[in-house]
Amino acid sequence: MASTGEPDRKRRHFSSISPSEAAAAVKKQPFFWPSSEDKLDTAVLQFQNLKLSQKLEAQQVECSILEDKLSQIKEKQLPYNSSLKTVHKSWEKLTASVESCSVRVSDSSSGAHRFVNKEDGSSPAVKNDFINRLLETGATESSSSNICSNQMEENGVNTSSQMTQTLYNLVAATEDLRCLKDELYPTVLRTNLGKDLCGQLALSELESEIKSFRGDLDDVLVKFKSLSRELQSHRDADAKVRVDLKRIRGELEDEVVELQQCNGDLSALRAERDATAGAFFPVLSLGNKLATSDRERDKQRDLQDMETVLKELTVLASGRLQQLKNLHEERTKMLGKMSNLQNKSKSVRCISSSQACLSLKDQLEKSKEAVFQYMALLEKLQVEKDSIVWKEREINIKNELGDVSRKTSAVTDSRMASLDSEIQKQLDEKMRIKTRLGNISRERGRKEIFADMKALISSFPEEMSSMRSQLNNYKETAGGIHSLRADVQSLSGVLCRKTKEYEALQLRSADYASQLGDLNATVCDLKNSHEELKLFLDMYKRESTDARDIAEAKEQEYRAWAHVQSLKSSLDEQNLELRVKAANEAEAVSQQMLAAAEAEIADLRQKMDDCKRDVAKHSDILKSKHEEHGTYLSEIQTIGSAYEDIVPQNQQLLLQVTERDDYNIKLFLEGITSRQMQDTLLIDKYIMDKDIQQGSAYASFLSKKSSRIEDQLRFCTDQFQKLAEDKYQKSVSLENLQKKRADIGNGLEQARSRLEESHSKVEQSRLDYGALELELEIERFNRRRIEEEMEIAKKKVSRLRSLIEGSSAIQKLRQELSEFKEILKCKACNDRPKEVVITKCYHLFCNPCVQKLTGTRQKKCPTCSASFGPNDIKPIYI
């Protein structure tokens, strides 16, 4: 803006606007000075506070709504918790029943005899592999381990231990049955050996079938392992999906934060726009109008850009929500597949009803029939086997007799050589121990070290007591010095008192001396007056007198006066004599007192000198004692430091002593051990000698036994009969074993039926648990969707509120702009803008209206009717 006058005229021009219009403008729009553009008006702050309070109330209402929804969801979850508890209880009952069944099976099978075939060593490995696979895949725990509660996680260890125990019991029972079969197989093979080739072929076929059965079982286990791996992969995929969900949620939260920041920027821009709209005075120039229009265009452009970004973000958020829905559906499908796979892998019925298991059962029945056939063949082959065995025994006895003699001689020779080498080693060890003991005995004895240490330790208290006595003496001497100091102080006090008395006596003697001087002066005056009187008398005697009467009268007068004077002088002399006597007596007394005081002062000075000498002596003694005390303290410190140095040395010596003791104890123990070893070696040597004697006796015994072999052959027939009886006993024991086998089979069938029932219950409970988990997961997903929809609705509401607030602000700005335009219009015509100012009253009008007024005679202002001339009209530029 360019005005026509000085600053005072500008101020008048500003004040030319009517006060009502200015008040209305202030009420409608807050006023900002150009120097405080960053400050807000109180009205704007109140308006913002009101908005914030409204937002807070809305957020409180939303929080209360969300809390109600959360309480409703918790109430919905209560029946699920009770159902989960019932499922856990049923699962615990089922595991307890399975464990009891396995314990009964293991107890029933514990009496059976176990025999492991060395040729087929795969059965324990298969058992351990089967149990490890079951435990690795989590067959003993719930199928959804990722979603289970904290209580299931806490009780998982106990349940897993119980299930492992039950599995071990079941596998042990099956292993007992297998061992029994493996025990029966060699007996059958021995009985039927060499009887029939067809039997051998059947046995080989049976063996191959059993091996194929085992291979099928291994294949089943491999399939089970593959299924468990697939299940684990599905679990890993589920975990990955959850991680992706978390990541997507984090991205959504970041985007929400960005949106909130954008909303904050929008609100800040709007506040700046409001501030800039109200920061300038309504009377603006054309350049400012263009600048504000450009700013409004820029802000509108920014708003449009932000709206487009917001739309893109909403589209992206909807796409992410759709992805989340798809992922949730895939996850539910995967959970269903996982539950089906787990049920298939953990159900005994499926395994038992599989084709491989049925074929194995058929093969097992066929093998049982073949076993019974081969039992009959075994009975036939037993007789031939006995004859062959007797012949083999005869040959073996002959061979063994020769081998025994050779082996005994070789064993005795090797044993003798080993014993000689061990004896030599023990002798070397004994010599080494003796040398070590001799070296130890040469070293300084322990008693001498202890005696030195005791003497050193006993000398310390004596030295300390002597030092303490010296310190006590020093303390006593220091106490005597203190008493002497007290005596000196008392004597110095007495001396001061005597000196004060001496000064007082000196003052008195000075007074007496002054009095004596006064008396002497008076005596001198009297003597002078007496001489003057004598002179006067001589003068009067020499004077010449005319008449004799006058002379006589004068003589009488003079005589009388002389008599009076003589009386006076005599009186004065007497008084003076009395006073002189008194003064002399007082002087004598004072002289005596002074002499006594001087004597006392001399005595006190002598005593003081003696005390000073004593003090000097004692101070010298004290200094020497202090020096000695310092030396003693330094010696004590050196002794203390030496004692402190000696203490660690003493500790080191004690440690060395303890180490020596430990070393001596070790040597003693080593000596004991060496003695024990020597004793054991002597005992072994004695035993070896006995063994050698026994070997020689055994050789003689074998030589005798060779002569008795013929006698033993005679008894072979008797032994044959005994063997027949043993055969009968073995057949009886075989029948008993078959009965036990039948009982075990019945118990196993019962255990299998119970196990199938328990597995069916477990499967049913797992299915119910899986369904409940699916429902719970769906409920959680729905809850999350509702929460996300609520957040989206909140964002929409906030966006709509911001749009509504922005539209209301734009309307206000437009109204204010129209008002400013009306203010800038001419008040005379209300059509054209203000272009001219009248400098008399500083009112603004358009140029045509002013020209009309100048054309008339009465040139007066239309607003204030003030007269003006053509020179008072000045143009302005807005």
From Swiss-Prot:
GO biological process: cell division; chromatin organization; defense response to fungus; innate immune response; leaf morphogenesis; positive regulation of cell division; protein monoubiquitination; regulation of G2/M transition of mitotic cell cycle
Domain of life from the UniProt record: Eukaryota
Transmembrane segment boundaries: none
Annotated localization: Nucleus
Stretches the record annotates as Disordered: 1-21
Pfam families linked: zf-C3HC4_3
GO cellular component assignments: HULC complex; mitochondrion; nucleus
Keyword Coiled coil assigned: yes
S-S pairs: none
Gene knockout outcome: Plants have reduced seed dormancy and several pleiotropic phenotypes, including alterations in leaf color, plant architecture and flower morphology.
Positions of RING-type zinc fingers: 826-865
Enzyme Commission number: 2.3.2.27
Pathway: Protein modification; protein ubiquitination
Principal cellular location given in the protein's record: nucleus
Classification via InterPro entries: E3_ubiquit_lig_Bre1, Znf_RING, Znf_RING/FYVE/PHD, Znf_RING_CS
Stated induction or repression of this protein's expression: By infection with fungal pathogens.
Tissue specificity remark: Ubiquitously expressed.
Keywords: Chromatin regulator, Coiled coil, Metal-binding, Nucleus, Transferase, Ubl conjugation pathway, Zinc, Zinc-finger
Catalytic activity: S-ubiquitinyl-[E2 ubiquitin-conjugating enzyme]-L-cysteine + [acceptor protein]-L-lysine = [E2 ubiquitin-conjugating enzyme]-L-cysteine + N(6)-ubiquitinyl-[acceptor protein]-L-lysine
Glycosyltransferase in keyword set: no
GO molecular function terms attached to this record: identical protein binding; protein homodimerization activity; ubiquitin protein ligase activity; ubiquitin-protein transferase activity; zinc ion binding
Additional facts recorded: HUB1 and HUB2 are involved in the same processes, but are weakly or not redundant.
Family to which this protein belongs: Belongs to the BRE1 family.
Function statement: E3 ubiquitin-protein ligase that monoubiquitinates H2B to form H2BK143ub1. H2BK143ub1 gives a specific tag for epigenetic transcriptional activation and is also prerequisite for H3K4me and maybe H3K79me. It thereby plays a central role in histone code and gene regulation. Forms a ubiquitin ligase complex in cooperation with the E2 enzyme UBC2/RAD6. Required for the regulation of flowering time and defense against necrotrophic fungal pathogens. Involved in the control of seed dormancy and germination.
Protein name: E3 ubiquitin-protein ligase BRE1-like 1
Organism: Arabidopsis thaliana
Gene name as annotated: HUB1
